[in-house]
């Protein structure tokens, strides 16, 4: 009698897995961003260091600290991938200077939490300073740059990242403006190529009830995981709001979004600034974790490219994909360290295979939700509908120009603005 219920449970579970697999990227992302999936995932992630420590205490294995540090690095890159996914995957902006905000946050915290300029702010004040500084730089770059489109925006943001690196390297001595030295002879703001050392960690309890003493490496792993959970929560809340829908509309078709009255500049700037502040806070946590702020890799273009690969690997606009991309691009290099000559070959082969077999990313690109038809059923945009649309009469250049002019007139009308 007991075999039949067990068999039915197995059949139901296999049916659920089959439905999950056939639901496609949209179904995968919806399923993986539900609370009943995310809450156990983050609770399990918080428990991983404790499990590693338990295994180390009860065996001859001694890798708990090493693997916790690897997972902390993975969580840090997952935070950066989620932040970049906001501006690239949601709003469709190609920000090649993204990692510069990570470096700005790192240096901003180091300056107010070290002896470099003899300032030691409390944690809440340091978070406020880092947020304001990164926001100021984001507005300084974003206000003029976001009026550009496509490749021009990418070029401007790339130039910003390169300029910030040079500025950090040169501020180990008093700057010279218009032939005059600004500041005393001994002025050293950023430490140049050496960076800023002896950055104080966060003033947090070193012991917790029921857990006892908490090592430094474990505490910062938990901080990264907690900040990642916070970013995921707010991103999911934003996605279903007017702001989130405006971002996706701008990404998919900016001209159509403008024609519908969306203030595209405002929403593009909001995505750009929010992503920058998130990256700055991640840089702050990193500086407190390693007690230093360095110009490399904090301002390296290679780091931006690596985070871009994580986002594209997981799927544009996919939050679980950003986490999966960070794991897939961070953990394997550590596993292949003993095969140093083959490490990058294996990683390259894996990336090429993903590009060939999953060009939209491991979890696919997230698009606008299915639309509702007059009959009340959900209609998906499929290849068949694209074929039907291709059979319609072609639109001439004159008609396109008329539409653009009409769209500009609508946007200028304040009654049509959101």
Model regions and ranges:
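Transmembrane alpha-helices and adjacent helix-loop boundaries
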Residues: 2-418
């Amino acid at each position: 009698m007991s075999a039949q219920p067990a068999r039915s449970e197995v059949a139901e579970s296999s049916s659920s897995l089959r439905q999950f697999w056939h639901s496609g990227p949209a179904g995968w992302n919806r399923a993986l961003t539900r609370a009943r999936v995310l809450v156990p995932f983050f609770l399990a992630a918080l428990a991983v260091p404790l499990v590693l420590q338990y295994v180390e205490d009860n065996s001859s294995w001694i890798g708990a600290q090493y693997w916790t540090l690897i997972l902390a690095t993975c969580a840090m890159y997952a935070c950066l991938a989620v932040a970049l996914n906001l501006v690239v995957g949601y709003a469709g902006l190609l920000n090649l200077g993204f990692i510069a905000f990570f470096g700005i946050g790192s240096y901003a915290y180091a300056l107010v939490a070290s002896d470099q300029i003899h300032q030691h702010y409390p944690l809440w004040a340091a978070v406020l300073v880092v947020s304001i500084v990164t926001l100021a730089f984001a507005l300084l770059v974003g206000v003029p740059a976001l009026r550009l489109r496509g490749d021009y925006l990418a070029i401007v943001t790339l130039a910003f990242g390169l300029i910030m690196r040079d500025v950090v390297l040169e501020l180990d001595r008093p700057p010279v403006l218009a032939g005059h030295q600004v500041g005393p002879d001994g002025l050293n703001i950023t430490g140049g190529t050496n960076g800023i050392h002896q950055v104080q960690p966060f003033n947090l309890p070193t012991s917790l009830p029921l857990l006892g003493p908490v090592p430094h490496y474990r505490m910062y792993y938990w901080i990264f995981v907690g900040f990642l959970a916070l970013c995921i929560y707010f991103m999911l809340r934003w996605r279903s709001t007017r702001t989130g829908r405006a971002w996706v509309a701008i990404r998919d078709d900016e001209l159509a979004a403008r024609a519908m009255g969306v203030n595209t500049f405002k929403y593009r700037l909001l995505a750009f600034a929010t992503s920058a502040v998130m990256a700055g806070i991640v840089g702050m946590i990193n500086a407190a974790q390693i007690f230093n702020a360095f110009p490399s890799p904090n301002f390296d273009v290679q780091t931006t490219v690596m985070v871009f690969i994580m986002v594209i690997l997981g799927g544009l606009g996919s939050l679980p994909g950003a986490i999966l991309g960070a794991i897939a691009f961070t953990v394997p290099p550590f596993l292949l360290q003993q095969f140093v000559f083959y490490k990058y070959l294996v990683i390259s082969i894996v990336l090429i295979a993903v590009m060939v077999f999953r060009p939209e990313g491991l979890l696919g690109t997230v698009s606008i939700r299915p639309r509702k038809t007059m009959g009340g059923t959900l209609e998906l945009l499929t290849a068949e509908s694209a074929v039907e649309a291709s059979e319609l009469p072609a639109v001439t250049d004159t008609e396109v120009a008329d539409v653009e002019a009409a769209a500009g007139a609508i946007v200028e009308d304040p009654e049509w603005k959101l």
